[in-house]
Amino acid sequence: MVLLKEYRVILPVSVDEYQVGQLYSVAEASKNETGGGEGVEVLVNEPYEKDDGEKGQYTHKIYHLQSKVPTFVRMLAPEGALNIHEKAWNAYPYCRTVITNEYMKEDFLIKIETWHKPDLGTQENVHKLEPEAWKHVEAIYIDIADRSQVLSKDYKAEEDPAKFKSIKTGRGPLGPNWKQELVNQKDCPYMCAYKLVTVKFKWWGLQNKVENFIHKQEKRLFTNFHRQLFCWLDKWVDLTMDDIRRMEEETKRQLDEMRQKDPVKGMTADD
């Protein structure tokens, strides 16, 4: 049994802008989660092309997770089992990410398939699942300006879209009805990231608990990440994809250093 949910994240940026903003924010967020032997290690970051013509950027990362998994898993899992591999094929505006664990092999999988569309999250079944499968998928809307969707320990005033005003674009702050207002704002673009998340965790007695925990963490990550992305708008809106590739190279070097020298930091599972 696998657990599927679709998270819809609406943003006051264009699909083209988001491509740069997402990559910038991934690099920055990685630094915030890396230290004390834990965090992100980038193994591969290179262009790819498949036989069917699909092409984009392929990345392979290892997440060293010790303090970032629940205590009940930490107690049961042997040393080294708490590292997960993330392989991503970014054929923007479509992206596919597959997360696996060498210890659990085919008993553990997180798959995130994302379509980025220039709409307000109104499309049904953008991933074109079979009607019977789609019927069982729960659609969850994430509102980046809704403080109630953010855990108090994750809240940062400087990363609050309800308070942020972009100097370069004039966008923000986002009020309670910002999504409805977007429709009438001719000068402000918008888009939705449709994130279909498949979770499989086969471990007798823990399956439901862990699958639900993972979905809860994915929603938390998507919420925090996209709040940051919008509030960092002025830092990335003028960047090109060439700028991003140079930044990713520098970030890889920094992450290797931070994992060795910095203390453990970032989100922990038991928060």
UniProtKB/Swiss-Prot annotation:
Which intervals of the chain form a coiled coil? none
Keywords attached to this entry: Acetylation, Cytoplasm, Lipid transport, Lipid-binding, Nucleus, Transport
Is-annotated flag, keyword Lipoprotein? no
According to its UniProt record, in which tissues is this protein expressed? Expressed in a wide range of tissues.
Q: Does the keyword section mention Phosphoprotein?
A: no
Family affiliation: Belongs to the PtdIns transfer protein family. PI transfer class I subfamily.
Name recorded for this polypeptide: Phosphatidylinositol transfer protein alpha isoform
Name the source organism. Answer: Rattus norvegicus
Q: Describe the reaction catalysed, as an equation.
A: a 1,2-diacyl-sn-glycero-3-phosphocholine(in) = a 1,2-diacyl-sn-glycero-3-phosphocholine(out); a 1,2-diacyl-sn-glycero-3-phospho-(1D-myo-inositol)(in) = a 1,2-diacyl-sn-glycero-3-phospho-(1D-myo-inositol)(out)
PTM comment: the record says:
Phosphorylated by PKC in a calcium and phosphatidylserine-dependent manner.
Where is the region Disordered? 251-271
Gene Ontology annotations for the cellular component aspect, listed alphabetically: cytoplasm; nucleus
Provide the GO biological process annotations: axonogenesis; phospholipid transport
